[in-house]
Amino acid sequence: LVEEFGFCKEHPAIAKAAEYLFSFQSKEGDFRGIYGNQYSPNYSAGITELLVKAGYRNDAHVQRVFEWLLSIRQEDAGWAIPFRTRNCNLDVIAKHSETIRPDKSKPFSYMVTGVVLRVFAAHPTYRKSKEAHQAGKLLLSMVFKKDHYLDRAGAEYWLRFSFPFWFTDLISALDTISLLGFSAQETQIEQALQWFVK
């Protein structure tokens, strides 16, 4: 409703949905559920992107998510699913009730970083942050390349498009990068745009 029809917090259904989401936000600031009790920067960012677009950008709950996202970045300035940085598979969701902390020395995931950057791009203040710009450069460096992790690892996933945006693909990445203020003259952006011309 938010992406396709522009619904915002004035609509009772959106207000009720936001209230529900805020009710299960963790003390740390993230949203959990899709991976059980495991951290999920992409899940938290995906929810928060819609909240920002629905008019909650100044809400304290949203601010807490941004603080959490910045605290859980990899050392290279991107994001990854923390349990993946510990070489865990999806079975960790059922087997581990304890939340697995990330190994921040491991590389970022382009898929996760692209999803997280969408919430930064949606927010008028955070889109101008140095952290968003650093992560944007990382995302561009991976265009048409394989991800570092198992989830949607193949380079072919760059060309599996969806709207509303869900995972990171070429269109969602270009949309995000443009909102972050990157120039169309960047080499990787030119290469990405050339794909559409061919």
For the regions a language model picked out, list residue spans one by one.
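Eukaryotic helix-linker segments that join adjacent hydrophobic helices
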Residues: 1, 18, 22-24
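An alpha-helical repeat/solenoid feature that recognizes helix-turn-helix modules
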Residues: 1-14, 32-64, 74-191, 198
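Blade-loop segments of beta-propeller domains
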Residues: 28-29
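Beta-rich carbohydrate-recognition and catalytic domains
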Residues: 67-68
